[in-house]
A protein has these predicted regions:
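Bacterial N-terminal signal peptides
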Residues: 3-14
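N-terminal pre-domain segments of enzymes
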Residues: 17-54
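Forkhead-associated
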Residues: 49-50, 55-122, 244
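Mid-length scaffold segments of soluble, non-membrane domains
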Residues: 75-78, 82-91, 191-237
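Conserved, compact domain cores that house catalytic/ligand-binding motifs in diverse enzymes
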Residues: 153-216
């Protein structure tokens, strides 16, 4: 019986992958990763520049900074133009003389490709730009960015737990054949049905835990974990933290909780982030990765 118990524990326990001699190298690797993450976040078109989200309705709506527009954007020309949503297409028509561009050109009319495309159509004027987003339930909206947004210019940086090699875990991987489907809630009140190729099982503090990663696309080459834990809403952002992992190999998957990072919603009220599903709310304090943003008001 004792041997059986030991074998069972060994089959699910998470393995620490960093030896004591390699701690310094590993710490530098994580610190470099964090620096790169910070630079992406702070980029002029990064998540810190998000200043608005305008949901569209079928039909034609005017857009500009003047109060008589259907959609008012503070830094836009007074009467920028109009947006028409008809069937599956959304089209932008710019008024003459606005100085606005469509994908960097002086065109005045174009179909707006949404963010499901690798390069959505971008309408820009001054420091401000917007593009179309498409969400579950047939919702379409304009995501508005301003490189001079106070969320970007007044950014306070990101606090994080000290790098802890014990939180880089090799978990057992159990593949699902066929893949399962998981309903992922989001902050705008809809559900995204996403494929789950399997589950990761690991042990921490003598207890076994499971996590369900999702695939973000049919050709995804990484697993996407949306997690919460006992630090959520206290030391870390309450809605979720994100982790990407390489695809499983030989029945194992590496989950590096030191790379757990805040979703865009931790920094702005205008993002459409997924929330951690009940299946991924861990009953353990994950004292690794990013902490709650000090500058957040939500």
């Amino acid at each position: 019986m004792l041997m059986t118990s030991l074998l069972l524990a060994a089959s699910i326990s998470g393995t620490q992958l960093v030896s004591a001699g390699n701690d310094d190298d590993y710490t530098r690797t994580i610190e470099t990763w964090r620096e790169q993450r910070l630079e992406r976040l702070k980029a002029p078109g990064g998540w810190l520049s998000l200043v608005g989200l305008e949901w569209l309705k079928p039909g034609t709506r005017t857009i500009g900074s003047a109060s008589d527009n259907d959609i008012v954007i503070a830094k836009a020309p007074a009467h920028l133009g109009s947006i028409e949503w008809k069937g599956d297409k959304v089209t932008i028509s710019l008024n003459e003389g606005t100085g606005a561009t469509i994908d960097g050109t002086t065109r005045t009319r174009a179909e707006l490709l949404d963010d499901a495309h690798e390069q959505p159509t971008v309408v820009a004027f001054g420091n401000v730009s917007f593009y179309l987003i498409d969400r579950a339930g047939g919702k379409k909206g304009l995501r508005i960015k301003d490189s001079e947004a106070t969320t970007r210019t007044g950014f306070l940086g990101i606090d994080a737990y000290p790098v802890d090699p014990s939180w880089r875990i090799e978990a057992k991987w159990v593949a699902f054949d066929p893949p399962h489907t998981l309903e992922i809630p989001n902050v705008i009140g809809t559900l995204d049905r996403m494929p789950v190729p399997g589950k990761a099982i690991f042990e921490r503090d003598g207890k076994a835990f499971e996590l369900l990663p999702v695939l973000e696309s049919d050709d995804a080459d990484e697993l996407f974990f949306i997690i919460a834990d006992k630090t959520s809403g206290k030391e870390t952002y309450g809605a979720a933290r994100f982790i990407y992992s390489a695809m499983p190999r030989d029945g194992k998957v590496v989950i590096d909780f030191n790379k757990a990072y805040n979703p865009p919603c931790a920094f702005t009220a205008f993002a459409t982030c997924p929330l951690a599903p009940p299946e991924n709310r861990l009953g353990v304090a994950v004292t690794a990765g990013e902490k709650k943003y000090r500058g957040s008001s939500h």
